[in-house]
């Protein structure tokens, strides 16, 4: 399934709803493009909703780290929401839970930006 990404505003935070596979090629490129567009629009508080991401490879993990770094370098914050079991396990295996703030509830995640 191809990656799809849409975004919406909630409580001053840009919530990016992502679905599909974040993999080498189109998937990681779309994520990179979406984050770049948000940063160009001065949107630096970003919550990535990964509830519908069914697969992520090492390239996808690299894009998440790159997105995090890019947002942080702009003085912003990027957090993760609704990890699937596969994505959760991969972040745990790669020890990226020490980098990302991860939430299972959108309301709590949005409050964390304040």
Tell me the role of every PLM-derived stretch:
Residues 4-33:
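STAS-typified acidic loop motif
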Residues 22-100:
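Amphipathic alpha-helical interaction surfaces in cytosolic regulatory modules
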Residues 85, 107-108:
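Acidic phosphotransfer microenvironment of two-component signaling modules
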Residues 101-105:
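Short acidic-hydrophobic, aromatic-tinged amphipathic segments that line or gate anion-handling sites
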Residues 109-114:
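Short, charged, intrinsically disordered terminal tails
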